[in-house]
Amino acid sequence: NLNSINDKKFTFIKGDISDSSLISKILKNYKPDKVINFAAETHVDKSIFGPEKFIMTNIVGTFKLIDTINLYYQDLDQNKKKNFIFLHVSTDEVYGSLSKDAPPFTEDHKYFPNSPYSASKASSDHIVRSFYMTYGLPVIITNCSNNYGPHQFPEKLVPFTILNAITLKKIPI
């Protein structure tokens, strides 16, 4: 739903998470107490044929973003620090593949990435966690599975499955 894009509470800023200068300006201008990182290169198959983009966005980009956010956080007064959270949206792909009889993944599972995509997301998770452990930056890491929504690329699992079902094609399992 893009109708709310015209709401005065919404501001769209085109940028790159690797642009520390831009991120710093945004933080100084808006003074957020919550930051959510949805930025990522996400297609497993594309990572196999072109991993560099995944490394640059998911690892280097996440590092530059969280490093800039940490500098912002360290300058906050104690009251604002109490309310600050950095939410890093990751993937269940960091845990590897499940066999048919295996129990579902939990946060206690060890990382076992199987592709450049999942390795880049696992690396970014470790970077984020290290900023919590080293600098005390409050972070939350989620390991979502097959997110979907409007305007999603049709090769992603949920839209691909739906399109195959309504056109009576084979559905992947």
Predicted ranges, named:
Residues 1-147:
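N-terminal Rossmann-like NAD(P)+-binding domain of SDR-like oxidoreductases, especially those catalyzing
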Residues 7, 11, 15-18, 159, ...:
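C-terminal substrate-binding subdomain of Rossmann-fold SDR/epimerase-dehydratase oxidoreductases
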Residues 122, 147-160, 167-169, 173:
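Glycine/proline-rich active-site loop of Rossmann-fold NAD(P)-dependent oxidoreductases
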